Design a protein with these regions (language model features):
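A glycine- and Lys/Arg-enriched "phosphate-lid" helix/loop adjacent to the NTP-binding pocket
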Residues: 114, 119-186
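Intrinsically disordered, low-complexity segments enriched in small polar residues
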Residues: 290-292, 299-301, 305-308
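Conserved nucleotide-binding/hydrolysis micro-motifs of P-loop NTPases
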Residues: 57-59, 111-112, 146-152, 209
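A short, Lys/Arg-enriched amphipathic alpha-helix followed by its capping loop at the start of a domain
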Residues: 38-47
Length: 322
């Protein structure tokens, strides 16, 4: 039976999700999108129905994230909540329905990229894991590894260095080249840790795309033929750490509403982090709309949020985390 990393979304019945969920992970420039563009038509030729999805493609939050990042002034907690909203919206409205219909779902990045980016920026690892506790466990996670010295020319000669992908918010005194090297090196270290915890299948993505694809094909066929969900023993340690973390006094389960559904989700009263995320979803929808309405342009051409677009992240997070 399909599993999550914690709580189920309201109305989700794991036994009904008969499709396959395959995550392609890796840093910027590793070739994830290229591989998905090769995998999808190949699977369709084999007779599989395929959905591909990826970060910031949510109709609800994707455009808001892009607008918010234009001003280069999004805080790390606010950014994490934006990405979580994008993910939960795609999970509820794209991934789950596709799996229910028997599709193969290919996702360009999954929660691991989102967690790695947040952790490198100093976000509490236990908190960020709890935000994504409703995520479905993929049937396979293929991590495309390329060292930083190979990433640099790939990015430089394709689309160039980007403020956020270069980690300029972390290394403001560095030039973009040095910031990119430092940030991507930190991400590679975090991916190595997450790979051990979540059971990544690591592939050397330094060869050309066709060579990497030839390595992926038999592994994907193996996943499609398997009926078992992978187990990640290292995950138990993180879950135990979360359970042992000091929190507010426990109480009876609290039923909270979830947008676009009439079914309640029972969450223990001391699971305040995940409950806060779900309860904050409406506030984030409003914030995204405000960002669009209140965007202003600075003298150097950058876009930044107006006063009406301010998000108060600490109102959504328990005092022990904020």
């Amino acid at each position: 039976m399909r599993k999550t990393y914690g709580s189920l979304l309201p109305g989700m019945k794991p036994a009904e999700l008969g499709g396959k969920l395959i995550a392609i992970e890796g840093t910027d420039g590793a070739g994830r999108t290229t591989q998905i563009n090769l995998i999808k038509p190949w699977l369709e030729e084999l007779g599989h129905a395929v959905l591909d999805t990826g970060m910031t493609r949510s109709c609800l939050a994707g455009d808001g994230i892009r607008r918010a990042k234009e001003g280069n002034n999004v805080g790390r907690v606010t950014q994490s909540l934006f990405y979580a909203t994008d993910f939960i919206d795609r999970l509820e409205n794209e991934i789950v329905p596709a799996l229910r219909a028997g599709f193969v779902v290919l996702t360009d990045r999954y929660i691991y990229s989102l967690m790695a980016r947040a952790i490198v920026r100093g976000v509490d690892p236990i908190w960020i894991r709890s935000i994504y506790s409703a995520a479905l466990r993929p049937d396979a996670v293929f991590y495309l590894h390329v060292d930083v010295d190979q990433l640099i020319p790939r990015v430089a000669f394709s689309r160039g260095f980007d403020y956020w992908e270069s980690g300029m918010d972390l290394y403001p005194a560095h030039d973009m080249y040095e910031a990119f090297r430092n940030y991507q090196s930190a991400l590679l270290r975090e991916f190595a840790r997450l790979g051990l915890e979540y059971g990544f299948e690591t592939l050397d993505a330094s060869p050309d795309a066709e060579t990497v694809f030839s390595v992926l094909r038999p592994r994907i066929l193996r996943v499609l033929q398997s009926t078992a969900q992978p187990e990640f023993p290292a995950r138990q340690a993180a879950e135990s750490d979360l359970a042992a973390r000091p929190s507010a006094a426990a109480g009876p389960p609290v039923a909270i509403g979830f947008p676009r559904t009439t079914e309640p989700l029972a969450i223990p009263a001391n699971s305040s982090i995940f409950a806060s995320l779900l309860a904050a979803r409406t506030d984030l929808e409003t914030a995204i709309k405000s960002l669009s309405r209140n965007a202003t342009t600075t003298s150097n051409g950058n876009t930044r949020s107006g006063a009406g677009a301010t998000i108060q992240p600490n109102a959504l997070i328990p005092p022990s985390v904020a």
